[in-house]
Swiss-Prot record:
It is an enzyme of class 5 (isomerase). Residues 54-79 have a biased composition (Pro residues). The gene is RECQL5. Induction: Repressed by drought. It catalyses: Couples ATP hydrolysis with the unwinding of duplex DNA by translocating in the 3'-5' direction; ATP + H2O = ADP + phosphate + H(+). PROSITE patterns: DEAH_ATP_HELICASE, HELICASE_ATP_BIND_1, HELICASE_CTER. A motif (DEAH box) lies at residues 390-393. PANTHER family: ATP-DEPENDENT DNA HELICASE Q4, DNA HELICASE RECQ FAMILY MEMBER. GO terms for biological process: cellular response to water deprivation; DNA recombination. It comes from Arabidopsis thaliana. This is ATP-dependent DNA helicase Q-like 5. It is found in: Nucleus.
């Protein structure tokens, strides 16, 4: 069954709270002059004239964007004139996107503009003073809250509105639109204009006529003046920022840091926790930062990156997160990223800029730290001032989103291999137990914890009991107030097929909705997210994959179609609503059958001691004990052989490397089977020139004229790295000498020490993995218990139903994150069943050919597939999922008893 793995999006920053009903501007001291534009405006080829749209005063940035007029707007004021009551800054529209899927083109939007490019282009970046007041006569206007469709409230007068240089009026936690990217200064300038050949022809004739009349030369002169003004202002902006950075280096005072914040980001003050974290980092103190989703955690490493002399290395779990964070770097910070999704030439270019000192912030995945060549650059020449561990809860096996690759992010490695001077660990959701584990691993003192409330107070939380008609219940909810008036809604599901099914159902009922999950092509995911951000889509029905890089502050509601897997997941996902500070609504549909199904799936990563023992025996086999031999484990075949998921095998191998005893050293994962075809020179000729080619000929077998060989075996035979072998055959390919294909993805490692007792090590690992499995189940039980309590409390108080449920859930969330998450939570799973053992006995007798373990039988009875017992085969038996309501451990115990009896009976029959 397809479902998306949990992922955090806590780096996504949010708009600071705004007043619900902003005022109209005060009196205008001196009216602005209307000046004809300098630049030419394209006209339609149609002979019919259209009425012009009426002129309006400058809009309030917090007000909802108006519906574009079908008529062309009036000519905008020229940017050459400086006597306007405000300045117009060129900014990129939120709806700007590229519809391509390639990594390089996705990343191209994230690139920054250098000073030299500013000087040559002159239009990519228009720096302006950060704050300019707009003065206008007082006027009472109707305003709509950004997250509502309709509203009828008249705005009372308040203080003057301030325009910021980022051009969008939002707070400093959603969009840093100073990256110098080319965009339209007037987005609707050419709207409605014909793009036909005749239109361009007419424009060209008109321009030539003006040149003939002497007007063309005047226009060119004025455009040249505009170019010079832009260059001067850009140089002035950069000079001001450099002065502010120098002032902070001299004295990291609150005043100097706030001035730098204002210049680069355009905001007057820091949010709670930001300034404290920045000052600790600049002081060289490793810090643990826990801020709510959307509270601006990324700013806490961006400002230090400007000040500190070395590189800031940001470790992030997903490529999509890295691309988003790179895209939102301000133009003054030069950034880059390294990912396995890049083409070789892209990675080479990034490494070149890194070595030349061009890049200040580098985004990498934790797997990159396995690359010996990458680490050697930092040991030899590059200086790392700060290592940022984003989504730091992934370090802890007790978190809701444990990732084995994060286990290698230990302070000892970061300080020794990268020579890091300071560590910043960031997360939005972490319990006390998780924080202790993360801070211990990264050696962050307990006094260096900055933790703010993990739940904002502008939510109305609610839960309802649902069943087979959940889709109908969802439709009824969305067609009732206040949801029917909310402009942007996210609906979270657990399974990929649900997103497509529910979004289609909503569209059939005239609700503009789209499904989103990790199985969609990258370009489709980008298009859906950007359409949602620009309000072209009202509802996104998504798995937990949605939310990374979400740049939208006015999401008005989050609806959970199923119970989340943990409190952390729930808080993280509802945190994507209400980032503009307005009241937002979060509803959860609780269904007991779905809860039991998710509880069964929580056991899918568990393993038996027998399977762990077989796995360790293979890892430490006689063939692998040779000194410095590069060993490999083909993932697909090993997964079926040991009935383990890829993630579980990776967890065990990582623990063998980073545990109390280092038994092995992990190497980069790669496709180990290479099929090589020689084209120009003969194999023997190339072998005479290259030791690697000679080793390939010795270690390969010829099949239909093709040489098939194992890359680790070739590398071990001549004592070189696997990357050297790959580099050699790639170089031959570039010369046209060979072509090759790679297959069989495998874990690669080198044995450093063999365990004395496999059984003892197997028992230790099984106990550790069982605790992780139990922790996952317990988190689901706690979330389920909180939802049920909120349902039951709705009829026991004089408060309104919404207020009662909100208080109940808030109380549970507070207790969970500030207490011990190991607190007992009753499970709804049945602890015994009269017919269970009888059915297991029948099941074993009817499937004598299979080799079962107690866990394999329990999974089948719960309707959960595994690598050795896939859904496609075993879902056909009538025992599949029959005992989903019975506790998994109870079934395992019954299965173990029946397996012993079954073996004894077979042995007796054999004798």
């Amino acid at each position: 069954m397809d479902f998306d793995s949990d992922s955090d999006g806590s780096h996504v920053s949010a708009t600071p709270p705004r007043d619900s009903f902003p005022s109209s501007p005060p009196q205008l001291q001196s009216p602005a002059k209307h000046v004809p534009p300098v630049s030419r405006k394209m006209t339609s080829s149609s002979s019919r004239s259209k009425p012009k749209a009426p002129t309006h005063p400058p809009p309030n940035p917090s007000q909802e964007a108006p519906v574009p007029s079908p008529y062309p707007p009036p000519p905008p004021p020229s940017p050459l004139f400086t006597n306007l009551p405000f300045r117009i800054c060129q900014s990129q529209p939120a709806r700007f996107s590229s519809s391509v899927s390639s990594f390089s083109r996705l990343c191209s939007r994230a690139s920054f503009t250098s000073v030299e490019k500013l000087k040559s282009d002159g239009v990519d970046f228009v720096p302006e003073p950060p704050l300019v007041e707009v003065i206008a006569p007082p006027k009472s206007v109707r305003r709509k809250p950004p997250n509502l469709i309709t509203d009828t409230i008249t705005s009372p007068p308040v203080k003057p509105m301030v325009f910021r240089s980022n051009g969008n009026g939002e707070g400093n936690f959603v969009k840093l639109n100073l990256n110098g990217k080319r965009g339209k200064k007037f987005p609707s300038k050419y709207k409605g204009v014909s793009k036909s050949r005749s239109s361009y022809s007419f424009r060209g004739k008109r321009y030539k006529k003006k040149e003939a009349d002497g007007d063309g030369e005047s226009l060119l002169e004025e455009e040249s003046d505009l170019q010079k003004q832009i260059e001067d202002e850009a140089n002035g902006f950069i000079s001001s920022v450099e002065d502010a950075i120098l002032a902070v280096k001299t004295e990291a005072s609150d005043e100097n840091l706030t001035k730098l914040l204002n210049l680069v980001y355009g905001y007057d003050s820091f949010r709670d926790g930001q300034l404290q974290a920045i000052k600790m980092i600049l002081g060289g103190s490793s810090t643990m930062l826990v801020l709510p989703t959307g509270a601006g955690k990324s700013l806490c490493y961006q400002i230090p990156a400007m000040i500190l002399p070395g590189i800031t290395l940001v470790v992030s779990p997903l490529v999509s997160l890295m691309i988003d964070q790179l895209k939102h770097l301000p133009s003054i910070i030069k950034g880059g990223l390294l990912s396995s999704s890049q083409r070789p030439e892209e990675a080479t270019e990034t490494l070149r800029k890194l070595k030349e000192g061009i890049i200040k912030v580098l985004f990498v995945s934790p797997e990159r730290l396995l690359n010996v060549e990458f680490l050697s650059m930092f040991r030899m020449s590059l200086s790392v001032s700060l290592v940022v561990v984003d989504e730091a809860h992934c370090v802890s096996e007790w978190s809701h989103n444990f990732r084995p690759s994060y286990m290698r992010l230990k302070a000892s490695m970061l300080f020794s291999e990268l020579k890091a001077e300071c560590i910043l660990a960031m997360t939005a959701t972490a319990t006390t137990m998780t924080l202790q584990a993360v801070m211990s691993s990264l050696e962050i003192p307990s006094t260096n914890l900055i933790q703010k409330s993990q739940l904002r107070d502008n939510f109305e939380l609610s839960v309802s009991l649902s069943g087979a008609n959940r889709m109908k219940d969802l439709l009824i909810l969305m067609e009732s107030p206040p949801y029917k008036e909310i402009r942007s809604i996210i609906v979270y599901c657990k399974f990929q097929y649900e997103t497509d099914m529910i979004s289609k159902y909503l569209r059939d009922n005239n609700i503009n909705a789209k499904g989103y999950h990790s199985g969609l092509p990258a370009k489709d995911r980008v298009r859906i997210q950007e359409s949602f951000c620009s309000n072209k889509i009202r509802v996104v029905v998504a798995t937990v994959a949605f939310g990374m890089g979400l740049d939208k502050g006015d999401v008005g509601a989050v609806i959970h179609f199923s119970v989340p897997g943990s409190m952390e997941e729930y808080v993280q996902e509802i945190g994507r609503a209400g980032r503009d500070g307005r009241l937002s609504y979060c509803h959860l549909f609780y269904d007991n059958d779905t809860y039991l199904k998710l509880r069964s799936l929580a056991h899918s990563d568990g393993v038996d001691e027998y399977a762990v023992g077989k796995f360790l025996t293979h890892v430490f086999s006689t063939e692998t004990k040779q000194h410095e031999k590069i060993c490999s484990l083909v993932i697909e075949s090993a997964s079926q052989k040991f009935d383990m998921k890829e993630e579980v095998m990776q967890t065990i191998l990582t623990h063998l490397e980073l545990g109390e005893v280092q038994y092995l050293r992990m190497l980069p994962q790669l496709n180990i089977c290479c099929t090589l075809n020689f084209h120009k020179s003969s194999p023997n000729t190339l072998a005479a020139r290259s030791a690697i080619v000679a080793a390939i000929l010795k270690k390969s077998h010829v099949k239909q004229g093709l040489h098939v060989f194992d890359i680790p075996a070739v590398a071990s035979s001549i004592c070189v790295a696997t990357t050297d072998v790959l580099a050699e055959i790639q170089a031959l390919k570039m010369k046209g000498e060979v072509t090759y294909e790679l297959k069989d993805s495998a874990f690669c490692y080198t044995i450093l020490k063999s365990p004395k007792e496999i059984c003892s090590l197997s028992s230790h690992l099984t106990k550790w993995l069982t605790e992780i499995e139990s922790c996952k189940v317990r988190k689901l039980d706690i979330m389920s218990s909180a939802a049920v309590a909120a349902i039951s409390v709705s009829n026991t108080s004089e408060l309104s139903s919404g207020a009662k449920q909100t208080r109940s859930l808030q109380s549970r969330i507070f207790d969970y994150f500030n207490g011990d998450e190991k607190c007992d939570s009753p499970s709804k799973a049945t602890q015994n069943c009269a017919f269970l053992r009888a059915d297991i006995k029948v099941f074993l007798q009817s499937n004598r050919q299979a080799k079962f373990t107690p866990r394999a039988i329990a999974r089948i009875m719960h309707g959960v597939g595994s690598p050795a017992f896939p859904n496609s085969v075993w879902s056909k038996t009538h025992f599949w999922g029959r005992y989903m309501n019975v506790d998994f451990r109870v079934i395992m115990e019954a299965a173990q008893t029946e397996l012993f009896n079954f073996v004894d009976r077979n042995a007796a029959l054999a004798t």
